Curated annotation (Swiss-Prot):
<dbReference type="GO" id="GO:0008381">
    <property type="term" value="F:mechanosensitive monoatomic ion channel activity"/>
</dbReference>
<comment type="function">
    <text>Channel that opens in response to stretch forces in the membrane lipid bilayer. May participate in the regulation of osmotic pressure changes within the cell.</text>
</comment>
<keyword id="KW-0813">Transport</keyword>
<keyword id="KW-0472">Membrane</keyword>
<keyword id="KW-0997">Cell inner membrane</keyword>
<keyword id="KW-1003">Cell membrane</keyword>
<keyword id="KW-0812">Transmembrane</keyword>
<comment type="similarity">
    <text>Belongs to the MscL family.</text>
</comment>
<dbReference type="InterPro" id="IPR037673">
    <property type="entry name" value="MSC/AndL"/>
</dbReference>
<keyword id="KW-0407">Ion channel</keyword>
<feature type="transmembrane region" description="Helical">
    <location>
        <begin position="79"/>
        <end position="99"/>
    </location>
</feature>
<keyword id="KW-0406">Ion transport</keyword>
<protein>
    <recommendedName>
        <fullName>Large-conductance mechanosensitive channel</fullName>
    </recommendedName>
</protein>
<dbReference type="Pfam" id="PF01741">
    <property type="entry name" value="MscL"/>
</dbReference>
<feature type="transmembrane region" description="Helical">
    <location>
        <begin position="9"/>
        <end position="29"/>
    </location>
</feature>
<comment type="subunit">
    <text>Homopentamer.</text>
</comment>
<keyword id="KW-1133">Transmembrane helix</keyword>
Length: 139
């Protein structure tokens, strides 16, 4: 029973739940970016370049023979994937930059130090009195 309770404690920690939410949102965001690049950015870019469909760009290394498919380097899909990556990396960079800015603003306004308790005040006074007595005794 101890292992189950340990797993439960681990699974409901804030960091684990936050990580799971981040992974799910990241996967959904990746799909959105892929659609954005493939369906919105690449077609106009292909027209500007001269009517090129990037998904069809490939180099055939060996033609298909019978049931054996062709060996192809699909560099157009690779270009599209690189553009996906650049957009995702930029979005993550902007998100991290915004979070860091918020953290810096919090750090600029530190909270006031807590006021000492009556016991701490009394101990401080006793310490100061002892220091002054010791200084008076030294030649």
């Amino acid at each position: 029973m101890g292992m189950i309770s340990e797993f439960k404690a681990f699974a409901v920690k804030g960091n684990v739940v936050d990580m799971a939410v981040g992974i799910i949102i990241g996967a959904a965001f990746g799909k959105i970016v892929s659609s954005f690049v493939g369906d919105i950015i690449m077609p106009p870019l292909g027209i500007l370049i001269g009517g090129v469909d990037f998904s069809d760009l490939a180099i055939t290394l060996k033609a298909a023979e019978g049931d054996i498919p062709a060996v192809v380097l699909a560099y157009g899909k690779f270009i599209q994937t690189v553009i996906d990556f650049v957009i995702v990396a930029f979005a993550i960079f902007m998100g991290v930059k915004a979070i860091n800015r918020l953290k810096r603003e919090e750090a600029v306004a530190p909270s006031a130090p807590p006021t000492p308790t009556p016991q701490e005040t009394l101990l401080t006074e006793i310490r100061d009195l002892l220091k002054s007595q010791n200084q008076n005794r030294l030649p």
